[in-house]
Amino acid sequence: MKKENRDKIVALRHDLHCHPELSMQEQETKNRLITFIKENIQLEVIDRGNWFYVQYTTKRQSEMPEADTKPPIAFRADFDALPILEDAESLPYASENPGVSHKCGHDGHASALAGLALELDANGADRDVYLIFQHAEEIGRGAQECVPLIKEKKIAEIYGFHNWSGFPKGAVVLREGVSQCASRGLTITFTGKKSHASIPEQGKNPSVAIAKLILYVQNLLQATTFEQLVLATIVNVEIGTKDFGISAGEGEISFTLRAALQRELDELEQMIRTQAEKFAAEEGLQLSYAYDDPFPETANDAKAIERVRNAAEKLHLP
């Protein structure tokens, strides 16, 4: 990449870092990216509302007849931020939006994809290429809105990456097979009956059942043998309110469940639900379940991995 283009995408990344936006609120971020692309290259930009893509179309038959036999491919990046306070205030491009920052590096992801757009515009490709700029990755909603494009354009392969600290600059780190665990948020609500704090026996307090479930899950992961990585992380527990005259009548516990294999994620959830029902029955409580942020496992295609490895070796990247 020419230094001029590199300087442009570094400046773009700093601009995005200054103005982070939360998932489903990224209109200004999207506009900044579209403006950058339209000001610097001639490729077509297609705005799909919450997200957009850039389209490189080969010159069919006349100059590149071989392109007709090569299926389209896509590259994808995200551009939403997180509800986390910026802790690098000394940087000249620190977040200007209180309580919001690019802690997952999506400013870098989107800028890198914009850099690829610059290269495509200058150097071309031997097939049609689609650059997908996706919103709302952090809450698991954005990708679903982009999926129809795959069928619409008959895209055969999609490539993406995540920045990863701790490796040499410019290193290309590849993982065969599963690269990201399947995961989902599970909230279990225990409903009993409130009573005066002086007569707790006349109510049904969920605290004992929730305490039992916490201990069960802690022991479960130590005692149970799964084929691959499995995690159940407690992210929130709420029981009653801070009212010293009332014995709690409702409580809930939330887990993030993760597993390298989808079937083991399902198995883990069922084990937790079975015990929750047992503990609830012992205390005379009712149960309900809610789910958030479901993600299937992400498994890398072996042939795609090999193509990336070969490209990195040709460029002498570590």
Can you say where each PLM-predicted feature lies in the sequence?
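Metal-dependent amide/peptide-bond hydrolase catalytic core
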Residues: 211-318
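Conserved active-site and cofactor/substrate-binding residues in soluble primary-metabolism enzymes
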Residues: 4, 24, 28, 32, ...
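Predominant activation on well-ordered alpha-helical scaffold segments within soluble catalytic domains
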Residues: 10, 34, 114-118, 144-147, ...
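Acidic/His- and Gly-rich active-site-bordering loop/insert found
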Residues: 1-102, 111-115, 119-127
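Histidine/acidic-residue-rich, glycine-tolerant segments that coordinate divalent metal ions
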Residues: 82-84, 89-101, 107-108, 123-233, ...
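Active-site beta-loop-alpha junctions enriched in small/polar residues
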Residues: 21, 78-80, 136, 164, ...
